[in-house]
Amino acid sequence: MQRITITIDDDLLETIDKISEQRGYASRSETLRDLVRDAVTREQAAVDSETKCYATLTYVYEHETRDLSRRLTTTQHHHHDLSVSTLHVHVDGHDCLEVSVLKGTVGEIKSFADSVVTQRGVRFGNLHLIPSEHGPHDHGPHSHD
């Protein structure tokens, strides 16, 4: 591990200290490492569409919007190879929240996410990519015992 020195303005340092306290980090170094790691991960994912990754796609939609539930289901079935699991929550009488866990290449997953969140009636779409150095399940079988 390398030690570096950086210069940060007071307002930014105050924000970093607040994040550190809120999340329970033991030091600024741990906070900065995680923040930098997150930024680097997002940049890597954005650069190479062939990078293997895991992802979560979270979105809220109005289930009463004409044919939306059917269109979303059709879209998911057309991309079944990317889907690991989907959680469906009835938020209230009008809205549903879905969280899809995905695996595949960045390009495939971004394309799928775009086809979901751009549908009329879908709101609050968020895609979180986690690049995988090894492709999904390249490590072989494992046990939780």
UniProtKB/Swiss-Prot annotation:
The keyword Electron transport does not apply. Its cofactor is Ni(2+). Gene3D superfamilies: ACT-like. Chain A, domain 2, Met repressor-like. It holds the Pfam family NikR_C. Ni(2+) binds at residues 77, 88, 90, 96. Binds 1 nickel ion per subunit. GO terms for molecular function: DNA binding; DNA-binding transcription factor activity; nickel cation binding. Keywords: DNA-binding, Metal-binding, Nickel, Transcription, Transcription regulation. InterPro entries: Acetolactate_synth/TF_NikR_C, ACT-like_dom_sf, Arc_rbn_hlx_hlx, CopG, CopG/NikR_regulator, Ni_resp_reg_NikR, Nickel_NikR_proteobac, Ribbon_hlx_hlx. It comes from the Bacteria. GO terms for biological process: response to nickel cation. NCBIfam families: nikR (TIGR02793), PRK01002.1 (NF002169), PRK02967.1 (NF002815), PRK04460.1 (NF003381). Transcriptional regulator. Belongs to the transcriptional regulatory CopG/NikR family. This is Putative nickel-responsive regulator. The lineage of its organism: Bacteria, Pseudomonadati, Pseudomonadota, Alphaproteobacteria, Hyphomicrobiales.
